[in-house]
Amino acid sequence: MANDQDPNKSLINDALTRSMSEFYDDDDDNDSDMCRANDEGEDVFDLPLKVGVSQSRNFSEVNDVLDPLSSLHGPSKKVRFEQQKQQQQHQQLHNDFNTDFNLKSPSSKKMGVEQLIQSANEINDYLANNIDKVNSFNSELLSGSGKLPGRVKSDTATQGTGRLDSMSNFALSDTELDNDDDNYLLDPLANASSTTPTVEHHGYSLLDKALSTSDKEKIYTNKVNSNSQIDTDNHSHESGNTTNNETDENESSEILDYTKFDSFPYPPSSAPNGEPPDLKVLSIECEQENEKELRRISLLLDHYESIPKIPELSDDEALSKFRENIELILQLSKKINDNANTLAISSEDPQKFVNFVMKNPPSLSFRDFIDRIQNKCMFGAVVYLGATYLLQLVFLTRDEMDGPIKLKAKLQEDQAHRIIISTIRIATKLLEDFVHSQNYICKVFGISKRLLTKLEISFMASVNFDGLMITCEKLEKTLHILDDTRQALGNT
């Protein structure tokens, strides 16, 4: 059966071959430039085709269908490709590949043996010098608390959204602030359009409210012409009528070059009859006040031994100490009327703390307020230790070196929130590398940026700027002062 089919198949192939040759005979003359005979006498076509690696994969399904039919048409025409061009292209690709390989080869970046040994020695020396820090860092990360170190903080709360977390602002009233930006110019010479300086043009509004009368006399000094009339009772609304229209323009007020003195001009409203105080007397008074404040700090701190080491407290423990300190000072303040011995002999002027009094009651207690700050800002223990130290510095002292703790100033409940704001913000700026932005911290505190600046200035003036030097020894003494405060409250 197979023998019968083979002759038939050969006959069919011969017939198809003859028909195809007759079909191409008519076009041989026209296609002489495209077709020529090779050594074997077969027709060869020069076609512009390119061979690729993946060409065999193209149209695989069509090739499978055409393969059986190709045998019916006899031997296929051989196509000769331009081998020379192929070789050139292949050589070019080979050269490009070698170039890229040399560029990417890691062997080109290998260091010499001496350089490698030197680098290894440097790494070993670094690890030997810092192995203690590496181990302590690992122990903190792997501790059971599951919290990162205090300085790795975030602007967003990572804890649950409870009642305290969901409130972005609350009623810490700052309605006493004026909306006019000109009233808060700290540069007294910022407004040069007026030839006669007035209280409002000098921009003393912010500092008038931030500082007490005694503090203003320390910081300011100014000379105003006696012919210039200033309405001190109504300067916030009628400052345009404060000068005498009959005063000659050539006799306008003379402003001293206050850069030559140790203190700045004080508001004319505070000067009696517009005359500046004697600078020598003012300097002596400032020195006496500074010595008095330094003695208060010394009586409070020098009672204890100086240990140059920061107390090892967790964030929650330091926060608890800060909260307890506020509660003890509030309790001592309530007992002043019953026991006069609670207040120190050299007590502070209550007017220094007027700016911390809130106009409206807050919607959160000071305890919840502290928790809110920690949930939103996640401060470390050192911040609350610093805030505790500043709080003790302002409100606590002693009459004698070995005497009991007494109040230097009375703390009221309507002052607690703003005192907390001031102590935490200043302690953060003094002790932390990571400080939240002014916009974010104001949202957490629930106050405006102006009021925050005002509270910071007021608090720093209350410590006379001498208590802002915080050391490890002072932070360590805060815990001893807290223990003595508990004893003072128990004795009363």
Swiss-Prot record:
GO terms for biological process: glycogen metabolic process; negative regulation of glycogen biosynthetic process; regulation of glycogen biosynthetic process. Coiled coil: none annotated. Residues 8-20 have a biased composition (Polar residues). Residues 1-32, 143-163, 223-252 are annotated as: Disordered. It comes from the Eukaryota. Pfam families: Cyclin. Keywords: Carbohydrate metabolism, Cyclin, Cytoplasm, Glycogen metabolism, Nucleus, Phosphoprotein. CDD domains: CYCLIN_ScPCL7-like. This is PHO85 cyclin-8. It comes from Saccharomyces cerevisiae (strain ATCC 204508 / S288c).
